[in-house]
């Protein structure tokens, strides 16, 4: 995938690939940074079986692997739970406009090419009016107003949606579902666009023995609740393991961990293995989107030189001969928020290492990771906010650690071309006008546990001119 820029009467081709959260990126990447044995990947085209990838996409869009979350009647009545001002607007709106308002309010995406769909992209229609969540609820988002499957959904208001679904069901005398009940004890996410997904995996895994038999006798695990920013899917093909700390093997079984509700017994999970092999093929077939705005090619070329001298040791190189080798940067060096690393207990990691998820240890599981993976930066322009917890709204803020906002709020469809990332308002405190829980969740407060924007200060050593050139280059990746 290439984009051509005209500069000085010449055409310059810059290879464009695009990425994830800008975690550790260092001028020297000291000797203690871990390069564990694994596959070295390059920018050659992905050779996935296209038919498997197509099947994987259809599985996600059409197969209900979980119980329903709500039905169409509940969905059409959610607006009645909103604050008075929005409720009044919804009451006066047409049904089509009210549906669009509901999608916007909860950060739901319409399927690409079908903006009038009643079924959000992140849900499966069961055929009888019920909706079942799929992976795309968190892993299909929009940037600059465009919906992109595989992009993190930085709008998704899972906690607000679940609370309003529960209240609406009670009003309509409908049976509560698994998420309605679980969320009474387990927080789903304190900021729109992030979720408590790590703890979801711990809790669900704790209901199984290592062979995937349902086992409710296991003691309840320690739970360190915190929010995570979903990574972009298009970088999975470059990685040899999964998650911010790289502890889990990259295989189709690990992708099934959010399907571990007791309703899905061992035999059911095993029957889905081929489906999830296809889903993994689809994930690894995704290419990142190209930067849609103007790029200063001369400045970007200067930025490439800065990047390769200062950042490439951790984050790889890009272009025709680019290479990325996955690297774990110790927490003591990167100094980003530690809660994610602390939240996964050793017992959970050993459960994965010893059991079915890792093919009984055949696939490597790191039970003692001491830091975070420096991710590939393909599509970095699109995948804001940055860091594993989504605490930094733009790449400019990544490069200027002292200027990262304490509290920030994004606009719905705006894109900051100058700072490269989310268009945001910045605050020193949470505004008192944010009176409802839903409204408060639209603000990212970096003072909360697990939400710190500290760390990754390596770019502070660069001259400002180098930072501006680097910012321009990152648009081209």
Locate predicted features:
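Bacterial N-terminal signal peptides
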Residues: 10-24
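Bacterial N-terminal signal peptides that target proteins for export
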Residues: 1-13
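Signal peptide processing junction and immediate N-terminal pro/mature segment
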Residues: 21-35
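Periplasmic c-type cytochrome electron-transfer domains
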Residues: 31-477
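Mature extracytoplasmic/luminal segments of secretory-pathway proteins
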Residues: 2, 18, 26, 132-135, ...
